[in-house]
């Protein structure tokens, strides 16, 4: 009685189990064809790994997490050429390894920072750091208001405080600038100096040249600011160290509008990675794959050598870093 109620028209339901496999296969094939057509219409003319129904972006992102940004960029440049299209966190990204064209890949996606209980300890740590920095700046401000000779107490923080007093900066600007110098400078500068010490140990003739120059320029006295322009060999050694073994070998930008780079269309919002580490190994340098001061015996155009980045988003502490490394 129940089967007759459910099937009042007496359809041949016994055939359904036999027909389902036969009908499923064409449907799956049709879906795959539709996916291929959809992917084909959106395929980019720029060389790079295929989209392949969303599998390509997952593999691309996984490679960056597994190999690291620098090694992954070098892999894609060697595999596909100087201009490559890949994906970061689902976003289309271009890697450009030549001179015409830096936290680059965050291991945590944006959604991580939108879930309060996941990033609570990071927010608290940031507040503690900011609070400690504000206390130090206020102590510096109080000290400047009581000293008799300002010349003896002028430094980076003092200049920022005076700029605030003139109305050029806000208190938040001063706090942020000092905080960035404290966070960004120690890591990159210390690693750069570490690499320089290794290169000095490996190249004793370069060490001898620098020592002779230092003795000629300064003698037995301490280094002064006027000595910096005269330390040419030391400067070339610093440049060559940053070229041969860069601490930061990538620069990342986001296209603010549709553009064309070297004939390739770039859509607004696309991430663009400039592979500086590879750019510094071009044939422009006499010995691009060797550590040699000959690479900087002649003036190097800025488009071939960008250790601190470029433009308004370049490293704000590059001049301070050069003085500190020379000293």
Swiss-Prot record:
The keyword Metal-binding applies. It is found in: Membrane. InterPro entries: Cyt_P450 (IPR001128), Cyt_P450_B (IPR002397), Cyt_P450_CS (IPR017972), Cyt_P450_sf (IPR036396), Cytochrome_P450_Monoox (IPR050196). Its main location: membrane. It catalyses: testosterone + 3 reduced [NADPH--hemoprotein reductase] + 3 O2 = 17beta-estradiol + formate + 3 oxidized [NADPH--hemoprotein reductase] + 4 H2O + 4 H(+); androst-4-ene-3,17-dione + 3 reduced [NADPH--hemoprotein reductase] + 3 O2 = estrone + formate + 3 oxidized [NADPH--hemoprotein reductase] + 4 H2O + 4 H(+). Keywords: Heme, Iron, Lipid metabolism, Membrane, Metal-binding, Monooxygenase, Oxidoreductase. One of its GO terms (biological process) is response to estradiol. Its cofactor is heme. One of its GO terms (cellular component) is membrane. One of its GO terms (molecular function) is aromatase activity. The keyword DNA repair does not apply. It comes from the Eukaryota. Its EC number is 1.14.14.14. Heme binds at residue 315. It is a peripheral membrane protein. Gene3D superfamilies: Cytochrome P450 (1.10.630.10). Belongs to the cytochrome P450 family. Catalyzes the formation of aromatic C18 estrogens from C19 androgens. This is Aromatase. It comes from Coturnix japonica. The gene is CYP19A1.
